[in-house]
Amino acid sequence: TAGVVDRDSDGLTIHGAKMLATGGVVANEVFVTCIQPLQPGDARFALSFAIPMNAKGLKILSRKSYEANAPSEFDNPLSHRFDENDAVLFFDNVHVPWDRVFIDQDVEMCQKQFHATPAHVYQNYQAQLRLMVKMKFLVGLGHKITETNGTTNFPQVRETLGQLAAQGAMVEAMVQAM
């Protein structure tokens, strides 16, 4: 895992790897932190900082896209459109200036940033948007399936479609309220 290997008056030097969630391959900046519980002695991994994706020594390895295995939109409607590329960041002695460092080797503060503040909610905003769009897609897909099957007017089917639509609208309202 990525950790501090050196420090000076200008900032930290980070070396190691860090798993990066969806969207990193198209980001201009990356927020690097630790959400996993750390053990005593893990202070060098208790970090929180932001850096540009083109920082010297920073490399990104993205997994192969699922789209390559789903060339037909008709045959693969989900994987053709909704691929999410997770990636790994490799820090090869990357310098992080002090003005980009939020937490430096403070295990307690590293955990509090997510469990004592709304930071985790805001950090996951992109995930909420992504899931909202998928929910809307699934509502539409469910309706299309019932049309194809000729079951749209069955009372129990209408009830289920109504519940799905209500849940989709509720998710969208909560995302917009953020």
Task: Place the predicted regions along the sequence by residue.
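Extended amphipathic alpha-helical segments enriched in small hydrophobics
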Residues: 126-178
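FAD-binding core of flavoproteins
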Residues: 1-130
